[in-house]
């Protein structure tokens, strides 16, 4: 099954790195959608179906907090899995998102293997990549 992925981060470099990690991790990606903030992400969701959303928290304009709150209140989007990819790790910041229905979070910087394991747990499949492609780098 090919997955449509929405990556939301104000850094174009980070969005490109996440795309690369998903590719080398063996996920069957149908289409990538990208937004630099929550407002762009909502515009994408209005016109496209996505299977998972990977979002930063700290972005200009509509941040990740407002984005997650909007998604989880919207009847068409509330069941789309959301994974935060953020520099935050403090429970007082992360726990409210988990209580809202966010599936998980990945702390930046991250290892490609971390994304592969967490998304495999959510999406249920990934091809095991060549270890030499993922073990030697952090993003």
Where in the sequence are the language-model features?
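A Lys-centered signature of the CheY-like receiver
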Residues: 10, 108
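Two-component/phosphorelay signaling modules centered on CheY-like receiver
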Residues: 12-33, 100
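Helix N-cap/capping motif at the beta->alpha junctions
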Residues: 34-43, 64
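Short amphipathic alpha-helix used as the core "switch/output" element in two-component signaling
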Residues: 43, 65-78
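Active-site residues of response regulator receiver
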Residues: 56, 86
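Receiver (REC) domain active-site loop signature in two-component systems and cognate sites
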Residues: 59
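Alpha4 helix (beta4-alpha4-beta5 surface) of REC/receiver domains from two-component response regulators
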Residues: 66, 89-104, 117
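C-terminal output helix
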Residues: 110-119
